[in-house]
Amino acid sequence: RFPAHLQQCDMESNGKSVNRFGERVNYVTGPIIFGEPGTNGQHSFYQLLHQGTDIVPLQFVGFKDSQIGTDVVIEGSTSQKKLCANVAAQIVAFACGKDDENKNKNFEGGRPSSIIIGDQLTPESLGSLLAHFENKIMFQGFVWNVNSFDQEGVQLGKLLAKRVLAHDTDAALKA
């Protein structure tokens, strides 16, 4: 659940509407982070990403070799090779698109993406990825002039939940 971890780190750290001095910002801070391993996202959010009206910059992470060292050959290639082919194909599809007379099958392309490719998922490569993304989050916070190290936005929900559990709905509604 690496995407979920990055989601928590990034969105909780930089999802702010005020800067370090408490002044409202007039620019977007903190991207929306989501993802799924392998091809799990293909029948959910990939549809929106390929043909939706919002253009969402994407970042893929992939590995050349299976993390377990052995792999099953299915229809002439390993599952790892199929995953690598799929990530490469998705990047081409997002970038280039495909014209079709049937507008339901038309893909505009021009959708930005990047990829980080490693040899194999190991403790060392996972640590490198974590360091990469944690530093990205920290530097984005510096650039946006937000405090990436407080999470005041989650406190209100916790406070209100306690009031609701205590059947103090009047206080919950006034908070």
Model-found features: residue ranges?
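A SIS-like phosphosugar-recognition module
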Residues: 1-175
